[in-house]
Regions:
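Generic structural signal for beta-strand residues in well-ordered domains
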Residues: 14-15, 120, 141, 169
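FMN-binding flavodoxin-like domain, especially the glycine-rich phosphate-binding loop
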Residues: 2-116
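Active-site-proximal loop/hinge segments that shape catalytic or ion-binding/gating pockets
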Residues: 188-195
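A mid-sequence, solvent-exposed acidic-amphipathic segment
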Residues: 103-136, 141
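Residue-level preference for short coil/turn positions at secondary-structure junctions
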Residues: 17-18, 123, 129, 157
């Protein structure tokens, strides 16, 4: 949130033979000051920073916000197509992305708020399953942090959660809840739309 959750993955990834780097980020409302952190990664890897593109997609952070219903999610994805196509064109042509918004709010949310938010709110201890869990292991497979294991055929969360919500939003039986905060909320996961 306001700094992408897989920061360590990106900063540790080797980019062999690359000279330039573009960052394409999706979000439910805004990416905050993520461009600053992307620029830092580019500098750290001795790459020419070509900018950060923001693609608005359906919200999936149901520990705090509401995800849209399926039809509304489809509209949001459809509305993102022009921004996606512009992004593709800029990369194909080797052009930098236009500068992203960088105001006081963005710097505040990505700066002092972000570490406090992660320290006190981004915890896995509120995740739980109900009796509809079928022990399929989808949550284990979908976790980018390898933070979930099946114990006695039920998911157990470790301490490396980034709140990506893949476990809760991809659960085929909607058996996972984040305390009471997610109860009754629609789950969002990407649904491929037919492109023109």
């Amino acid at each position: 949130m306001w700094v992408y959750p897989l920061w360590s993955v990106y900063s540790e990834t080797e980019l062999l033979s690359a000279k330039r780097i573009w960052f394409v980020m999706n979000c439910g409302s805004e990416i905050g000051n993520a461009a600053k952190y992307n620029r830092n990664i580019a500098e750290q890897k001795h790459l020419c920073y070509m900018g950060t593109s923001q693609i608005l997609m359906p919200e999936n952070y149901i520990a705090m916000f509401d995800a849209p219903e399926a039809e509304e999610a489809r509209k949001i994805v459809k509305n993102a197509e022009p921004a996606i196509m512009d992004t593709v064109v800029w990369i194909k042509e080797g052009q930098p992305f236009p500068a992203t918004r960088n105001n006081l709010y963005d710097r505040f949310m990505s700066g002092p708020v972000n570490p406090i938010f992660y320290r006190f709110f981004v915890k896995a201890n509120a995740f739980q399953t109900d009796d509809t869990c079928i022990s399929c292991g989808q949550c284990v497979e979908n976790c980018p942090m390898n933070n979930i294991t099946l114990e006695s055929d039920k998911p157990t969360w470790g301490k490396q959660c980034t709140h990506c919500m893949a476990c809760i939003c991809y659960c085929p039986t909607e058996a996972i809840e984040y305390g009471k905060k997610s109860m009754g909320k629609p789950r969002y996961h990407f649904e491929q739309l037919k492109m023109k």
